[in-house]
Amino acid sequence: MHKINTWEGRLVNKNMKYLVIGDVHADYLPFKRAVNFATENDLHLICVGDLIDNGEDGAICVSEMLKLLETGKATMIKGNHEHKIIRHLNGANVLLGPPNMVTLNQMETDKLFEHEFRQMVEEYCQEYVKLNDTLYFTHGGMHQDFWEAEKTGNITRRMYDDMMFGQADYKKTFHHKGQDYPYRTYDWKDSVPGHVKLFVGHDPAPLTGEPNFDSFQPEPTVYVNEQGGTTVWLDCGAGKGGKLFGVVVNSSTNEIEDTIDFTQND
């Protein structure tokens, strides 16, 4: 069952400003700087997913995010890493890699971590969120047919999968740290409507296709398609040796007012 993907009931002022951050991957110091910046500047924090895995700080990142969620000061998108870990915890047979094992090994001895993670995912994580029909936030991407399907409420399982995983060519793979990953495809970016800004994470080297997770964009990528629809890729490799970036978004103007690097040679 999917949660209602709107801001209503989330204690959010629709005319306020937001700090939207990329994938954290359990890298606490830059995440804490982002939280502090949002708090000091009265910004609602939006994480576009993948708060956990890879890094060693998953427990404290989840605990801090949960406090923000419970007080209505943050919104959490479900990333593919949250999706995989919660499925494993619930008994599903999923393929686990080294990044996942960092989290699961910690949960074996830290049951509070597991409890708070479950609470975060089951009570608060959403596949996508929209604001004023012009600002959309998800993890991996939006299926080309999503924009029409949303109008009628006929959002399919495939569309929800694309929100978490993006799209890929499974006939072509890249070997990375013991696992094969499909090449990523980006045709969906050209279907974003002209009035929409779409913010995503997931991909630290967008528009290249090759899933080389040791290669990171130096700052968020902004792509504008022919009809004026905008996609912003925020993942810059935090928790993997890269950086954590955030953008300040004004919901009254739909503009990005600032781009901030929260990594300081950690």
Positions of predicted regions on the chain:
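Active-site environment of divalent metal-dependent phosphoester hydrolases
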Residues: 25-29, 53-56, 82-86, 144-145, ...
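Residue-level marker for buried hydrophobic side chains located in beta-strands
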Residues: 20, 45-47, 76-77, 136, ...
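Active-site-proximal beta-strand elements of phosphoester/diester hydrolases
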Residues: 17-25, 135-141, 232-234
